[in-house]
Amino acid sequence: FKTAQIYEYETDPNNLIPTIDKFSRYKKNGDGTYTAKNKLANRCWKLQHANVITWDGLVVPCCFDKDATHQLGNLKMQSFKEIWHNENYKHFRTELMKSRKNIDICANCSEGVSVWKD
């Protein structure tokens, strides 16, 4: 199964979060807000193995960067090998290993976490 990623999950203004806890990556807090159900480790398999190349040649970390806000490089200007070793990529890797939860696309990601808890 894949769980739905909700952009505004803290308040869920469109009521998109599943009501059955088992099928949600979010948990409801006592004050009515939501948080991610699981703790994020400061590592990511996708960053190393599942980059995304957008229609216009931009390289982004993964499929969670739907709006290409974390551009690591542009294949029209560099080879993938050059992008893999450039400063943007190195900086993103470093930030992820320091605090994955502080990167917007990573804070709302289910990679490496167990969502399906009974």
Predicted regions mapped to residue ranges:
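Radical SAM enzyme [4Fe-4S]-AdoMet core and its adjacent flexible, acidic
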Residues: 1-83, 87-98, 111-118
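Short metal-coordination and nucleic-acid-contact micro-motifs, chiefly zinc-binding Cys/His arrays
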Residues: 102
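Short cysteine-rich clusters marking metal-coordination/redox-active sites
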Residues: 106
